UniProtKB/Swiss-Prot annotation:
SMART domains membership: B3_4, B5
Name assigned to this protein: Phenylalanine--tRNA ligase beta subunit
One GO process term, biological-process aspect: phenylalanyl-tRNA aminoacylation
Keyword Transport: no
Description of how the protein assembles with itself and partners: Tetramer of two alpha and two beta subunits.
Residue stretches making up the B5 domain: 266-342
Binding-site positions, Mg(2+): 320, 326, 329-330
NCBIfam families documented for this protein: pheT_arch
Reaction catalysed by this enzyme: tRNA(Phe) + L-phenylalanine + ATP = L-phenylalanyl-tRNA(Phe) + AMP + diphosphate + H(+)
Any GO molecular function: phenylalanine-tRNA ligase activity
InterPro entries: aa-tRNA-synth_II/BPL/LPL (IPR045864), B3/B4_tRNA-bd (IPR005146), DNA-bd_dom_put_sf (IPR009061), Phe-tRNA-ligase_IIc_bsu (IPR045060), Phe-tRNA-synth_IIc_bsu_arc_euk (IPR004531), Phe-tRNA_synthase-like_B3/B4 (IPR020825), Phe_tRNA_ligase_beta2_arc (IPR022918), PheRS_beta_core (IPR041616)
Localization, UniProt: Cytoplasm
Statement: the UniProt record of this protein carries the keyword Aminoacyl-tRNA synthetase: yes
């Protein structure tokens, strides 16, 4: 969840109404007011709505929701005449780029803070900590077009933001705070991505830091926006959100030609949806004109296209609209959840804890007592993490997504240990020892089962630790088991064992293989364990 600081003064200016009305209705569009201060409110927005991560975006949504200004916001984009080229050597490093020229900005301290907060929130929500998307905002009047996105030698020097002296690119990774934070994204490449102007001045070292030359201040009037990354759709989404937020503040947007194609594309997407399906889903009988009116409150363009159809124009910044039901959810929000009739269920029953949840809770308590910290890794992952890095063959039983929107999430997990190793990778610069565990569902052969897994990393982590902690967990859960030699290539030969319960394999434990550690960029040994919780006495049959 992203917590955004909304200035009352700026919010009132952009919405045209008072703060009391805004704060009362703001939670109804998908937010929670965390804290009220004298001059601002800290508001938590759901991560599926990154377009709300700024005062400008929140004000745009509230104007529609309050009926002040409804319908599709239209953003004019005219050509800037500025070109961008992309070095072909970046194809294997960071190949994707979007850009725009934003003119006539009027910055004060509040609006600069809003834009910078939006930038960082997008790095988190869309950019996966800058690895997938990174955003650069530059004072256009300090540099000379055309611009070039190049693969540069690591010895290239420039003055990074907030510094006064030149550093090499390697030096920035070592000495600049942002360099240390994000070095892991680029450090293994022989060349580094740079954005330079026509006079070879460095604008940006994405995804690390901008140059001091292009610093944005209250005197800045014209902006060059660059968005780089590894996923073009995500890059375009971030660019559209930044551009439209600044347009809401009164700026004008101009396109940049990137290898012959104009960016950004702020045209709406068009969908035609069923009124009958929407009414059945939300439980409210609507006509096509009524549904169109509700959608316009949520800042869509909408018009009836027949008695059972509405033609919807989806704003370019609404990256969360991927299915008709996403639109139906917005219809329900506009209708007002407080207006839905309350119905008492016709039958009465008494609930109790499901046995599977009871056993999982018991397992969590045991591992917490052993000093492990609970994680909640995603259910979706990819075969690089699940198979390649673990030295395991791809499994036909793996459930694959037909239309993944990202190469990071293409399959449903069949094991939990690989995802815990990925979490150790993210936290490898933190203090040791690190002991993590997770419980949750895995799917193989279309069968959903619940697993328990743990990993422990420190200089002394070994098979003995894995065995001791596995034995403690199994005994506390009342599992009668035996250990047999395992052939799992993810573990070191001779330091791995299968958990056998009732003559069947129910899990595995051991010391992770050095090749797997290298694949996850881990420098210390790792002890690991995974158990199918169906082996625990009292676990319910499917």
């Amino acid at each position: 969840m992203a917590i955004i600081s909304l200035s009352y003064k700026y919010l009132e200016r952009l919405t045209g109404t008072d703060r009391e009305t805004i704060l009362k209705r703001l939670p109804m569009i998908g937010s929670e007011v965390e804290r009220l201060e004298e001059d601002h409110a800290d508001v938590e927005f759901f991560p599926n709505r990154p377009d709300l991560f700024s005062v400008e975006g929140a004000a745009r949504a509230m104007r529609g929701f309050l009926g002040i200004e409804t319908g599709l916001p239209r953003y004019m984009v005219k050509p800037s005449g500025i070109r961008f080229t992309i070095d072909s050597k970046l194809a294997a490093i960071r190949p994707c780029l979007a850009s725009a020229v934003i003119r006539n900005v009027s910055f004060d301290d509040e609006s600069i803070l809003s834009v910078m907060a939006l930038q960082e929130a997008l790095h988190w929500a869309v950019g996966r900590g800058r690895s997938k998307v990174a955003i650069g905002i530059h004072d256009l009047d300090t540099i000379t077009p055309p611009f070039h996105y190049v693969a540069s030698p690591r010895v290239r020097k420039f003055v990074p933001l907030d510094f006064t002296d030149e550093l090499t690119l390697d030096g920035i990774l070592e000495k600049h705070p942002k360099g240390r934070d994000y070095a892991k994204i680029v450090k293994d490449f022989p060349l580094f991505p740079l954005i330079v102007d026509n006079e070879d001045h460095v604008c940006s070292f994405p995804p690390i830091i901008n140059g001091e030359r292009t610093r944005v201040t209250t005197a800045t009037k014209n902006i060059l926006l660059d968005v780089t990354g590894t996923d073009q759709r995500a890059v375009n989404v971030a660019a559209n959100i930044i551009c439209t937020a600044l347009a809401e503040a009164g700026a004008t947007i101009e396109s940049v030609e990137i290898n012959g194609a104009p960016f950004p594309d702020l045209a709406p997407a068009v969908r035609t949806v069923s009124v009958r399906e929407c009414s059945a889903l939300i439980g409210v009988d609507l006509t096509a004109p009524q549904m169109a009116e509700l959608l316009e409150k949520m800042r869509f363009g909408a018009e009836p296209a027949g008695p059972d159809q509405v033609r919807v124009q989806v704003p370019c910044y609404r990256a969360d609209i991927m299915h008709d039901w996403d639109l139906f959810e917005d219809v329900a929000i506009a209708y007002g959840y407080e207006n839905f009739a309350v119905e008492v269920p016709p039958t009465f029953s008494i609930g109790k804890e499901h046995p599977a949840n009871r056993i999982a809770g018991q397992a969590r308590a045991i591992l917490a007592g052993l000093g492990y910290l609970e994680m909640m890794p995603f259910t979706l992952t990819n075969e690089r993490v699940l198979c390649d890095r673990m030295q395991r063959p791809g499994e036909p039983a793996t459930l694959r997504l037909m239309h993944p929107i990202s190469e990071e999430y293409t399959v449903v997990r069949t094991d939990i240990v690989p995802l815990l190793l990925e979490m150790l990778q993210v936290n490898r610069h933190r203090e040791l020892p690190q002991r993590l565990f997770a419980t949750g569902d895995v799917i193989a052969d279309l069968l959903t089962t619940q697993r328990l897994a743990f990993v422990s990393t420190h200089a002394g982590a070994d098979f003995s630790e894995a065995y001791a902690h596995a034995d403690a967990v199994l005994r506390e859960l009342g599992v009668a088991y035996s250990a047999e030699v395992s052939d799992d290539a993810a573990f070191i030969e001779g330091r791995r064992a299968d958990i056998i319960v009732g003559g069947k394999k129910a899990g595995v434990f051991g010391e992770i293989h050095p090749a797997v550690l290298t694949a996850f960029e881990l420098e210390q040994p790792v002890a690991a364990f995974e158990l199918d919780l169906r082996a625990v006495p009292g676990y319910p049959s499917p």
